Protein backbone atom coordinates (compact mmCIF):
# COMPACT_ATOMS: atom_id res chain seq x y z
CA UNK A 1 0.00 0.00 0.00
CA UNK A 2 1.39 3.39 -1.04
CA UNK A 3 1.98 5.79 1.80
CA UNK A 4 0.52 9.28 1.30
CA UNK A 5 1.88 12.77 1.83
CA UNK A 6 -0.83 13.35 4.42
CA UNK A 7 0.15 10.25 6.40
CA UNK A 8 3.81 11.22 6.45
CA UNK A 9 2.98 14.78 7.49
CA UNK A 10 0.86 13.56 10.38
CA UNK A 11 3.68 11.28 11.54
CA UNK A 12 6.26 14.02 11.12
CA UNK A 13 4.32 16.39 13.36
CA UNK A 14 4.70 13.87 16.17
CA UNK A 15 8.50 14.05 16.06
CA UNK A 16 9.50 17.28 14.26
CA UNK A 17 8.23 20.76 15.26
CA UNK A 18 5.48 21.58 12.79
CA UNK A 19 6.41 18.45 10.85
CA UNK A 20 9.20 20.20 8.95
CA UNK A 21 12.84 21.17 9.38
CA UNK A 22 12.44 24.63 7.83
CA UNK A 23 9.20 26.64 8.24
CA UNK A 24 8.36 27.43 4.60
CA UNK A 25 8.13 23.70 3.85
CA UNK A 26 5.01 23.42 6.01
CA UNK A 27 2.81 25.11 3.34
CA UNK A 28 1.54 27.46 6.07
CA UNK A 29 1.56 30.39 3.66
CA UNK A 30 -0.43 28.63 0.93
CA UNK A 31 -2.35 26.09 2.99
CA UNK A 32 -2.70 22.37 2.40
CA UNK A 33 -0.44 19.39 2.99
CA UNK A 34 3.29 19.55 2.23
CA UNK A 35 4.62 17.25 -0.48
CA UNK A 36 7.12 14.60 0.63
CA UNK A 37 9.63 13.89 -2.13
CA UNK A 38 11.58 10.68 -2.62
CA UNK A 39 13.72 11.23 -5.71
CA UNK A 40 14.66 13.75 -8.38
CA UNK A 41 16.19 13.67 -11.85
CA UNK A 42 16.94 16.64 -14.05
CA UNK A 43 14.18 19.24 -13.92
CA UNK A 44 11.69 16.96 -12.19
CA UNK A 45 11.11 15.18 -8.92
CA UNK A 46 8.66 12.59 -7.62
CA UNK A 47 6.71 12.47 -4.39
CA UNK A 48 6.08 9.42 -2.20
CA UNK A 49 2.79 8.81 -3.99
CA UNK A 50 4.60 8.50 -7.32
CA UNK A 51 3.43 11.79 -8.83
CA UNK A 52 5.99 13.77 -10.84
CA UNK A 53 6.45 17.54 -10.81
CA UNK A 54 8.46 20.02 -12.84
CA UNK A 55 10.52 21.71 -10.14
CA UNK A 56 10.96 25.50 -9.96
CA UNK A 57 12.30 25.52 -6.40
CA UNK A 58 15.51 23.53 -6.93
CA UNK A 59 16.11 22.99 -3.21
CA UNK A 60 15.70 26.78 -2.86
CA UNK A 61 18.48 27.54 -5.32
CA UNK A 62 21.45 25.16 -5.03
CA UNK A 63 20.47 22.78 -7.84
CA UNK A 64 21.50 24.92 -10.79
CA UNK A 65 22.35 21.76 -12.76
CA UNK A 66 19.09 20.04 -11.83
CA UNK A 67 18.49 17.00 -9.66
CA UNK A 68 21.05 14.19 -9.48
CA UNK A 69 23.35 15.53 -12.18
CA UNK A 70 25.47 12.47 -13.07
CA UNK A 71 28.82 14.27 -12.80
CA UNK A 72 27.95 15.70 -9.39
CA UNK A 73 26.72 12.31 -8.20
CA UNK A 74 29.98 10.69 -9.32
CA UNK A 75 32.04 13.38 -7.60
CA UNK A 76 30.13 12.87 -4.36
CA UNK A 77 30.42 9.09 -4.53
CA UNK A 78 34.14 9.29 -5.23
CA UNK A 79 34.77 11.71 -2.36
CA UNK A 80 32.63 9.74 0.10
CA UNK A 81 34.48 6.54 -0.75
CA UNK A 82 37.69 8.17 0.51
CA UNK A 83 36.17 9.47 3.74
CA UNK A 84 33.19 11.62 4.66
CA UNK A 85 34.97 14.02 7.03
CA UNK A 86 38.47 14.63 8.35
CA UNK A 87 38.30 17.76 10.50
CA UNK A 88 41.64 18.71 8.98
CA UNK A 89 42.88 20.58 5.88
CA UNK A 90 42.43 18.96 2.46
CA UNK A 91 43.70 19.72 -1.02
CA UNK A 92 40.10 19.93 -2.27
CA UNK A 93 39.17 22.78 0.05
CA UNK A 94 42.22 24.69 -1.18
CA UNK A 95 41.13 24.02 -4.76
CA UNK A 96 37.65 25.44 -4.25
CA UNK A 97 39.04 28.45 -2.34
CA UNK A 98 41.42 29.19 -5.21
CA UNK A 99 38.59 28.82 -7.72
CA UNK A 100 36.26 31.15 -5.81
CA UNK A 101 38.97 33.80 -5.54
CA UNK A 102 39.72 33.48 -9.26
CA UNK A 103 36.08 33.78 -10.29
CA UNK A 104 35.28 36.70 -7.97
CA UNK A 105 37.91 39.46 -8.00
CA UNK A 106 36.57 40.92 -4.72
CA UNK A 107 37.60 37.73 -2.87
CA UNK A 108 41.21 37.97 -1.73
CA UNK A 109 40.74 35.43 1.06
CA UNK A 110 37.80 33.09 1.68
CA UNK A 111 36.64 30.94 4.59
CA UNK A 112 34.40 27.89 4.07
CA UNK A 113 31.47 27.20 6.41
CA UNK A 114 28.42 24.94 6.34
CA UNK A 115 25.41 27.24 5.83
CA UNK A 116 24.41 30.68 4.65
CA UNK A 117 23.33 31.58 8.18
CA UNK A 118 26.80 30.69 9.46
CA UNK A 119 28.42 32.76 6.72
CA UNK A 120 26.21 35.76 7.48
CA UNK A 121 26.72 35.73 11.24
CA UNK A 122 30.47 35.29 10.77
CA UNK A 123 30.68 38.19 8.33
CA UNK A 124 28.80 40.44 10.76
CA UNK A 125 31.08 39.46 13.65
CA UNK A 126 34.12 40.03 11.45
CA UNK A 127 32.88 43.48 10.39
CA UNK A 128 32.33 44.47 14.00
CA UNK A 129 35.72 43.15 15.02
CA UNK A 130 37.49 44.90 12.17
CA UNK A 131 35.81 48.29 12.63
CA UNK A 132 35.38 48.29 16.41
CA UNK A 133 31.75 49.36 15.88
CA UNK A 134 28.48 47.64 16.77
CA UNK A 135 25.74 49.01 14.54
CA UNK A 136 24.77 47.32 11.28
CA UNK A 137 22.27 48.22 8.58
CA UNK A 138 20.00 45.71 6.90
CA UNK A 139 16.94 46.21 4.71
CA UNK A 140 13.33 45.28 5.27
CA UNK A 141 12.42 42.11 3.40
CA UNK A 142 16.02 40.93 3.00
CA UNK A 143 16.80 37.63 4.70
CA UNK A 144 20.34 36.79 5.75
CA UNK A 145 19.80 33.67 7.84
CA UNK A 146 18.50 33.18 11.35
CA UNK A 147 21.27 34.88 13.31
CA UNK A 148 19.91 36.97 16.20
CA UNK A 149 21.41 40.20 14.85
CA UNK A 150 19.61 39.73 11.53
CA UNK A 151 16.18 38.53 12.70
CA UNK A 152 15.05 42.11 13.07
CA UNK A 153 12.12 44.05 11.68
CA UNK A 154 11.84 47.78 11.13
CA UNK A 155 10.81 50.13 13.90
CA UNK A 156 8.32 52.94 13.56
CA UNK A 157 10.57 55.23 11.52
CA UNK A 158 13.50 55.11 9.14
CA UNK A 159 16.02 55.77 11.90
CA UNK A 160 14.34 53.69 14.59
CA UNK A 161 16.46 50.89 15.90
CA UNK A 162 15.10 47.49 15.01
CA UNK A 163 12.90 45.22 17.05
CA UNK A 164 13.14 41.41 17.13
CA UNK A 165 11.12 39.52 14.53
CA UNK A 166 11.48 36.24 16.45
CA UNK A 167 10.94 35.26 20.06
CA UNK A 168 14.23 34.54 21.77
CA UNK A 169 16.11 37.46 20.21
CA UNK A 170 17.21 39.89 22.95
CA UNK A 171 16.06 43.46 22.43
CA UNK A 172 19.58 44.71 23.10
CA UNK A 173 20.88 42.54 20.24
CA UNK A 174 18.19 43.77 17.87
CA UNK A 175 18.85 47.33 18.99
CA UNK A 176 22.19 47.38 17.20
CA UNK A 177 20.53 46.66 13.86
CA UNK A 178 19.07 49.48 11.79
CA UNK A 179 16.38 48.36 9.34
CA UNK A 180 15.86 50.59 6.31
CA UNK A 181 13.73 50.36 3.18
CA UNK A 182 15.20 48.49 0.22
CA UNK A 183 16.06 50.74 -2.73
CA UNK A 184 15.55 53.86 -0.56
CA UNK A 185 18.58 56.01 -1.35
CA UNK A 186 17.41 58.99 0.71
CA UNK A 187 16.85 56.82 3.77
CA UNK A 188 20.36 55.40 3.59
CA UNK A 189 21.89 58.84 3.14
CA UNK A 190 19.98 60.20 6.15
CA UNK A 191 21.03 57.29 8.33
CA UNK A 192 24.71 57.62 7.48
CA UNK A 193 24.50 61.39 7.98
CA UNK A 194 23.30 60.83 11.54
CA UNK A 195 25.07 57.62 12.57
CA UNK A 196 27.84 56.97 10.05
CA UNK A 197 30.64 56.82 12.62
CA UNK A 198 28.80 54.03 14.50
CA UNK A 199 28.01 51.76 11.54
CA UNK A 200 30.22 48.68 11.21
CA UNK A 201 28.60 47.33 8.06
CA UNK A 202 25.75 47.37 5.62
CA UNK A 203 24.49 43.93 4.58
CA UNK A 204 22.30 43.68 1.50
CA UNK A 205 21.03 41.24 -1.12
CA UNK A 206 21.83 42.76 -4.55
CA UNK A 207 18.81 40.86 -5.79
CA UNK A 208 16.44 40.12 -2.93
CA UNK A 209 15.00 36.62 -3.01
CA UNK A 210 12.96 36.31 0.17
CA UNK A 211 10.39 39.01 -0.55
CA UNK A 212 9.89 37.28 -3.86
CA UNK A 213 12.44 38.63 -6.35
CA UNK A 214 13.21 42.34 -6.14
CA UNK A 215 16.16 43.87 -7.96
CA UNK A 216 18.29 46.55 -6.37
CA UNK A 217 18.55 49.68 -8.48
CA UNK A 218 22.08 50.53 -9.62
CA UNK A 219 21.84 53.90 -7.84
CA UNK A 220 20.95 52.16 -4.56
CA UNK A 221 23.98 49.85 -4.63
CA UNK A 222 26.29 52.63 -5.83
CA UNK A 223 25.11 54.80 -2.93
CA UNK A 224 25.80 52.02 -0.44
CA UNK A 225 29.31 51.59 -1.84
CA UNK A 226 30.03 55.32 -1.74
CA UNK A 227 28.72 55.82 1.80
CA UNK A 228 30.47 52.76 3.21
CA UNK A 229 33.76 53.96 1.76
CA UNK A 230 33.23 57.51 3.04
CA UNK A 231 32.42 56.38 6.59
CA UNK A 232 34.88 53.44 6.77
CA UNK A 233 32.02 50.96 7.09
CA UNK A 234 32.08 47.59 5.34
CA UNK A 235 29.73 46.71 2.49
CA UNK A 236 28.64 43.07 2.72
CA UNK A 237 26.92 41.61 -0.34
CA UNK A 238 24.77 38.61 0.51
CA UNK A 239 25.12 36.48 -2.62
CA UNK A 240 23.92 33.24 -1.06
CA UNK A 241 21.12 33.17 -3.64
CA UNK A 242 22.65 35.16 -6.47
CA UNK A 243 26.15 33.70 -6.28
CA UNK A 244 26.84 31.76 -9.52
CA UNK A 245 23.09 31.78 -10.11
CA UNK A 246 22.70 35.09 -11.97
CA UNK A 247 26.06 34.96 -13.74
CA UNK A 248 29.63 33.70 -13.45
CA UNK A 249 30.71 36.90 -11.67
CA UNK A 250 27.56 36.81 -9.52
CA UNK A 251 25.42 39.91 -8.97
CA UNK A 252 28.44 42.04 -8.09
CA UNK A 253 29.67 41.46 -11.63
CA UNK A 254 26.32 42.39 -13.14
CA UNK A 255 26.14 45.62 -11.14
CA UNK A 256 29.84 46.46 -11.24
CA UNK A 257 29.98 46.77 -7.44
CA UNK A 258 33.01 45.63 -5.44
CA UNK A 259 32.00 44.74 -1.86
CA UNK A 260 34.32 44.51 1.12
CA UNK A 261 32.88 41.11 2.06
CA UNK A 262 30.75 38.60 0.15
CA UNK A 263 28.57 35.79 1.48
CA UNK A 264 28.12 32.73 -0.73
CA UNK A 265 26.12 29.52 -0.41
CA UNK A 266 23.59 27.33 -2.23
CA UNK A 267 25.17 26.82 -5.69
CA UNK A 268 28.74 26.56 -4.34
CA UNK A 269 27.72 23.44 -2.41
CA UNK A 270 26.03 21.73 -5.35
CA UNK A 271 23.11 20.65 -3.15
CA UNK A 272 25.17 19.74 -0.10
CA UNK A 273 25.64 21.89 3.03
CA UNK A 274 28.36 24.40 2.22
CA UNK A 275 28.73 28.17 2.21
CA UNK A 276 31.54 30.71 2.39
CA UNK A 277 32.41 34.29 3.19
CA UNK A 278 35.35 36.23 1.91
CA UNK A 279 36.69 39.55 0.75
CA UNK A 280 39.44 42.05 1.43
CA UNK A 281 42.67 40.54 2.72
CA UNK A 282 43.11 43.09 5.52
CA UNK A 283 39.60 42.35 6.79
CA UNK A 284 39.77 38.56 6.46
CA UNK A 285 43.14 38.45 8.25
CA UNK A 286 41.30 39.54 11.40
CA UNK A 287 39.90 35.99 11.59
CA UNK A 288 41.47 33.41 13.89
CA UNK A 289 44.07 31.96 13.76
CA UNK A 290 45.59 35.15 12.30
CA UNK A 291 43.51 37.69 14.19
CA UNK A 292 41.24 38.23 17.19
CA UNK A 293 37.85 37.43 15.59
CA UNK A 294 36.95 33.84 16.40
CA UNK A 295 35.16 31.59 13.92
CA UNK A 296 35.31 27.81 13.60
CA UNK A 297 33.35 24.77 12.42
CA UNK A 298 33.68 21.01 12.76
CA UNK A 299 32.38 20.32 9.25
CA UNK A 300 33.73 23.43 7.53
CA UNK A 301 35.30 22.40 4.22
CA UNK A 302 33.65 18.98 4.37
CA UNK A 303 35.25 16.94 1.56
CA UNK A 304 31.99 15.52 0.19
CA UNK A 305 30.32 18.94 0.05
CA UNK A 306 33.45 20.44 -1.50
CA UNK A 307 33.43 17.74 -4.19
CA UNK A 308 29.82 18.55 -5.11
CA UNK A 309 30.62 22.26 -5.14
CA UNK A 310 33.73 21.90 -7.27
CA UNK A 311 31.94 19.87 -9.92
CA UNK A 312 29.02 22.30 -9.99
CA UNK A 313 31.36 25.27 -10.39
CA UNK A 314 33.20 23.47 -13.18
CA UNK A 315 29.92 22.97 -15.03
CA UNK A 316 28.75 26.58 -14.75
CA UNK A 317 32.00 27.77 -16.33
CA UNK A 318 31.01 26.06 -19.60
CA UNK A 319 30.87 28.73 -22.35
CA UNK A 320 27.29 29.84 -22.93
CA UNK A 321 26.00 28.25 -19.71
CA UNK A 322 24.45 31.42 -18.29
CA UNK A 323 23.24 32.65 -21.68
CA UNK A 324 21.15 29.50 -22.07
CA UNK A 325 20.00 29.55 -18.45
CA UNK A 326 18.91 33.17 -18.74
CA UNK A 327 17.14 32.48 -22.02
CA UNK A 328 15.12 29.62 -20.51
CA UNK A 329 14.24 31.66 -17.45
CA UNK A 330 13.07 34.58 -19.58
CA UNK A 331 11.06 32.20 -21.76
CA UNK A 332 9.25 31.10 -18.60
CA UNK A 333 8.57 34.60 -17.25
CA UNK A 334 7.65 36.10 -20.63
CA UNK A 335 5.41 33.14 -21.36
CA UNK A 336 3.62 33.31 -18.02
CA UNK A 337 3.04 37.02 -18.50
CA UNK A 338 1.64 36.45 -22.00
CA UNK A 339 -0.83 33.76 -20.98
CA UNK A 340 -1.91 35.83 -17.98
CA UNK A 341 -2.63 38.84 -20.22
CA UNK A 342 -4.45 36.57 -22.66
CA UNK A 343 -6.76 35.42 -19.86
CA UNK A 344 -7.26 38.81 -18.24
CA UNK A 345 -5.27 38.02 -15.08
CA UNK A 346 -3.41 40.82 -13.28
CA UNK A 347 0.13 39.49 -13.30
CA UNK A 348 3.77 40.43 -13.83
CA UNK A 349 7.11 38.64 -13.75
CA UNK A 350 10.84 39.25 -14.08
CA UNK A 351 14.07 37.28 -14.17
CA UNK A 352 17.77 37.64 -13.44
CA UNK A 353 19.94 34.79 -14.70
CA UNK A 354 18.38 31.60 -13.35
CA UNK A 355 16.20 33.38 -10.75
CA UNK A 356 12.69 34.66 -11.31
CA UNK A 357 9.80 36.33 -9.57
CA UNK A 358 6.09 36.05 -10.31
CA UNK A 359 3.64 38.56 -8.89
CA UNK A 360 -0.10 39.00 -8.89
CA UNK A 361 0.15 42.76 -9.44
CA UNK A 362 0.45 44.93 -12.55
CA UNK A 363 4.18 45.62 -12.36
CA UNK A 364 7.15 43.96 -10.66
CA UNK A 365 7.73 45.37 -7.16
CA UNK A 366 10.72 47.50 -6.20
CA UNK A 367 10.22 47.44 -2.42
CA UNK A 368 8.95 45.38 0.49
CA UNK A 369 5.84 47.58 0.66
CA UNK A 370 4.98 46.87 -2.96
CA UNK A 371 5.33 43.10 -2.67
CA UNK A 372 3.07 43.20 0.39
CA UNK A 373 0.44 44.85 -1.81
CA UNK A 374 0.35 41.91 -4.25
CA UNK A 375 -2.67 39.59 -4.35
CA UNK A 376 -1.57 36.71 -2.13
CA UNK A 377 -4.90 34.92 -2.37
CA UNK A 378 -4.52 34.82 -6.16
CA UNK A 379 -1.00 33.44 -5.77
CA UNK A 380 -2.20 30.72 -3.38
CA UNK A 381 -4.90 29.62 -5.82
CA UNK A 382 -2.36 29.63 -8.64
CA UNK A 383 0.08 27.57 -6.58
CA UNK A 384 -2.43 24.84 -5.78
CA UNK A 385 -3.95 24.60 -9.25
CA UNK A 386 -0.48 24.43 -10.82
CA UNK A 387 0.48 21.78 -8.27
CA UNK A 388 -2.42 19.67 -9.51
CA UNK A 389 -1.01 20.13 -13.02
CA UNK A 390 2.35 18.75 -11.86
CA UNK A 391 4.15 22.10 -11.63
CA UNK A 392 5.93 22.89 -8.35
CA UNK A 393 6.47 26.57 -7.60
CA UNK A 394 7.68 27.90 -4.25
CA UNK A 395 4.92 27.47 -1.64
CA UNK A 396 4.94 31.15 -0.72
CA UNK A 397 4.23 34.42 -2.51
CA UNK A 398 7.42 35.79 -0.94
CA UNK A 399 10.00 33.43 -2.40
CA UNK A 400 11.92 33.67 -5.66
CA UNK A 401 11.82 30.77 -8.10
CA UNK A 402 14.67 28.99 -9.85
CA UNK A 403 15.30 27.49 -13.27
CA UNK A 404 18.09 24.95 -13.75
CA UNK A 405 20.23 23.94 -16.70
CA UNK A 406 18.09 20.80 -16.88
CA UNK A 407 15.01 22.83 -17.79
CA UNK A 408 14.52 22.86 -21.54
CA UNK A 409 11.84 23.78 -24.03
CA UNK A 410 9.80 20.70 -23.16
CA UNK A 411 9.53 21.60 -19.47
CA UNK A 412 8.90 25.29 -20.09
CA UNK A 413 6.26 24.58 -22.73
CA UNK A 414 4.45 22.15 -20.42
CA UNK A 415 4.49 24.77 -17.69
CA UNK A 416 3.05 27.46 -19.95
CA UNK A 417 0.34 25.13 -21.24
CA UNK A 418 -0.62 24.34 -17.66
CA UNK A 419 -0.60 28.02 -16.73
CA UNK A 420 -2.87 28.81 -19.67
CA UNK A 421 -5.40 26.27 -18.37
CA UNK A 422 -5.10 27.61 -14.84
CA UNK A 423 -5.34 31.28 -15.81
CA UNK A 424 -8.39 30.52 -17.94
CA UNK A 425 -10.05 29.63 -14.62
CA UNK A 426 -9.13 33.16 -13.40
CA UNK A 427 -6.58 32.01 -10.80
Swiss-Prot record:
Catalysis performed (reactions): (S)-4-amino-5-oxopentanoate = 5-aminolevulinate
Q: Which GO terms describe its molecular function?
A: glutamate-1-semialdehyde 2,1-aminomutase activity; pyridoxal phosphate binding; transaminase activity
Q: What class of enzyme is it?
A: isomerase
Q: Which residues carry this modification: N6-(pyridoxal phosphate)lysine?
A: 266
Query: Which InterPro entries does the entry mention?
Result: 4pyrrol_synth_GluAld_NH2Trfase (IPR004639), Aminotrans_3 (IPR005814), Aminotrans_3_PPA_site (IPR049704), PyrdxlP-dep_Trfase (IPR015424), PyrdxlP-dep_Trfase_major (IPR015421), PyrdxlP-dep_Trfase_small (IPR015422)
Keyword entries, A-Z: Cytoplasm, Isomerase, Porphyrin biosynthesis, Pyridoxal phosphate
Its pathway, per UniProt, is: Porphyrin-containing compound metabolism; protoporphyrin-IX biosynthesis; 5-aminolevulinate from L-glutamyl-tRNA(Glu): step 2/2
UniProt KW NAD keyword: no
The cofactors named for this UniProt entry are: pyridoxal 5'-phosphate
E.C. number(s) listed in UniProt: 5.4.3.8
- Which PANTHER family does the entry link to? GLUTAMATE-1-SEMIALDEHYDE 2,1-AMINOMUTASE, GLUTAMATE-1-SEMIALDEHYDE 2,1-AMINOMUTASE 1, CHLOROPLASTIC-RELATED
Q: What is this protein called?
A: Glutamate-1-semialdehyde 2,1-aminomutase
Which species? Nitrosomonas eutropha (strain DSM 101675 / C91 / Nm57)
Q: Which gene encodes it?
A: hemL
Amino acid sequence: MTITNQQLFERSRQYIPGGVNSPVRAFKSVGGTPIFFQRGQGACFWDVEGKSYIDYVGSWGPLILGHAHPDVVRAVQDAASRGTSFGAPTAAELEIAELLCRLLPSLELVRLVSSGTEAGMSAIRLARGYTGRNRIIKFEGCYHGHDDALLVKAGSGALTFGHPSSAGVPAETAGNTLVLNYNDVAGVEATFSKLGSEIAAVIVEPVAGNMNLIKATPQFLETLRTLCTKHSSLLILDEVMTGFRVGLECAQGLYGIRPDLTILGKVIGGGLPMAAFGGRRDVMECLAPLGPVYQAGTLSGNPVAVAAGLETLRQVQTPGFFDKLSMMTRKLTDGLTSVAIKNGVVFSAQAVGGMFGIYFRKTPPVSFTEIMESDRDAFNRFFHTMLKEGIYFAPSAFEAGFVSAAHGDVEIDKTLEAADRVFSQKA
